[in-house]
Regions:
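Amphipathic alpha-helix face/heptad-repeat signature
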Residues: 17, 164-168, 194, 250-253, ...
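Glycine- and acidic
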Residues: 3-11, 61, 240-244
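Structured mid-to-C-terminal alpha-helical surface segments
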Residues: 209-270
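Conserved NTP/Mg2+-binding pocket subregion across the NTase superfamily
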Residues: 2-10, 77-188, 192-195, 201
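Catalytic metal-binding acidic patch
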Residues: 41-77, 92-97
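Helical scaffold of the NTase/Pol beta-like nucleotidyltransferase catalytic core
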Residues: 1-40, 71-72, 270
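Extended, well-ordered alpha-helical segments in internal regulatory regions
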Residues: 199-207
Length: 270
């Protein structure tokens, strides 16, 4: 596949995004060879709200069999080389390599070769959010190479989406109870991420669907009562602020928002 025949759904992307995707495709095919089944885009690229300023490039690679240590080493070298590529998105990749059997349905405790934004390839345990990732790929994933993802991933029910979201929401409640966690003092962009994530949680629980962050924000602005509507609105000015540290009032407000979402979801305050 070349830049000229990328799916039309991503043909509008900036050249530096498609350039990274082209290098990603070539490198994966070279490293994996005949074990490759398919390569799919997920996340904001799949859901149609990719933001060149803040979004990362989420991908999923499907393989016939579990990656061998030799193939893992080859992929690690490739990803290290790609990370040094003179392109702003070369460090904005998040993806995983999952074999056909494991991909069909999420099973807790499994580990797969995974790369996170700004990091290298590692063997990582996939948590319950990979129910949501599978759903996104199955229902909206963009196929770069390979069969329709619906042929590879079993249907995921609304009840399974609810269960996965509630598990993640409990994790967020635990986090909101930890005022001494240093990550609460990260720049305002982090607080925007928390607010956006809570909006997505509420959207899924209310609508039985998964949407992008921008879509969830618009929905929340039309749906949430005060003071939370105003918080959601203000948070959008924080999205690209990677410098300003939040004051304690903002941190407290965002924490209360997490607890409000949890209460609406039927989770008792912890």
């Amino acid at each position: 596949m070349t830049l000229s025949n990328f799916p039309t759904t991503i043909s509008h992307l900036p050249n530096n995004v498609t350039e990274v995707l082209q290098n990603l495709l070539y490198g994966i095919q070279e490293a994996i060879g005949e074990n490759l089944v398919g390569i799919y885009l997920r996340g904001s690229l799949a859901l149609g709200d990719f933001d060149p300023k803040t979004s990362d490039i989420d991908f999923l690679v499907v393989i016939n069999d579990t990656i061998t240590e030799e193939k893992f080493a080859n992929l690690s070298v490739f990803h290290s080389q790609l990370a040094s590529f003179p392109n702003q998105y070369a460090l904005d990749l998040e993806g995983a390599y999952i074999d056909l059997d494991a991909l069909k349905r999420y099973r807790a405790g499994e580990i797969h070769p995974t790369i996170y934004r700004g990091g290298g390839l590692q063997w990582g345990e996939h948590r319950i959010n990979w129910v949501l990732e599978r759903w996104t790929v199955r229902e909206h994933g963009i196929t770069l190479i390979g069969p329709d993802p619906k042929k590879l991933i079993e249907p995921i029910s609304v009840e399974e989406l609810y269960s996965a979201v509630l598990v993640r929401l409990r994790d967020w409640v635990d986090y909101a109870n930890q005022l001494d966690d240093p990550t609460w003092r990260l720049p305002l962009s982090h607080k925007a991420y928390v607010v956006e994530t809570m909006c997505r949680v509420m959207f899924t629980l209310d609508c039985g669907d998964i949407c992008s962050k921008p879509h969830a924000i618009l929905w929340a602005l039309e749906t949430f009562p005060e003071p939370w509507r105003s918080l959601v609105e203000r948070s959008q000015s924080w999205r690209i602020d990677n410098v300003t540290s939040p004051d304690v009032n903002i941190i407290s407000e965002v924490m209360r928002f997490v607890h409000w979402v949890a209460s609406k979801a039927g989770l008792s305050k912890q």
